[in-house]
Design a protein with these regions (language model features):
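Aromatic-anchored segments of alpha-helical transmembrane domains
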Residues: 22-31, 79-90
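Membrane-helix exit/interface motif
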Residues: 29-39, 60-64, 93
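Juxtamembrane helix-break-helix junctions at the cytosolic face
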Residues: 58-76, 81
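Alpha-helical membrane-associated segments of multi-pass integral membrane proteins
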Residues: 102-136
């Protein structure tokens, strides 16, 4: 299959792949740190949450490599956008114990702060890729 259009759009699936894989890695790291901070999550719960949170972005990742890029874009934008909104509120704006500015110093505090910031960055970039993909007007031709 050939695509017409600029090379930046042709690289969109690659950029999306990098972002989704980075997001998955940071989410797992973040959940492991949360488990160490609060001891409320078992390993099985961490695994289940990681799978559920990454299910839609990985579906979008697969679709980015097909002719369904617009759908992939909307899935990325929705899933990572929701994560970005929830994470920004929970870790930076709310008065919860998971606020990076109010968290008591401890062994895992720095890693928690790092993962919270990394999640914001990666999810923000993922939303940008989602917008780009959802607005794509490329025509796919089957040889």
């Amino acid at each position: 299959m050939k695509m017409t259009g600029g090379s930046a759009m042709n690289r969109l699936p690659l950029y999306g792949t990098v972002i989704v894989l980075a997001n998955c890695g940071v989410i797992v790291w973040h959940l492991l740190v949360l488990a160490r901070l609060h001891s409320m999550l078992s390993d099985g719960q961490i695994l289940l949450i990681a799978i559920l949170v990454n299910l839609i972005p990985f579906t979008a990742l697969l679709l980015l490599w097909t002719r369904f890029r617009k759908i992939a874009g909307w899935l990325l934008l929705a899933s990572l956008g929701i994560g970005l909104l929830i994470g920004t509120y929970e870790h930076f704006l709310s008065s919860s114990p998971d606020n990076v500015f109010r968290m008591a110093p401890g062994e895992w505090t720095l890693q928690f702060r790092i993962t919270a910031v990394l999640l914001m960055i990666v999810e923000g970039l993922g939303c940008w890729i989602g917008v780009k993909a959802s607005r794509e007007n490329h025509v796919f031709r089957v040889p």
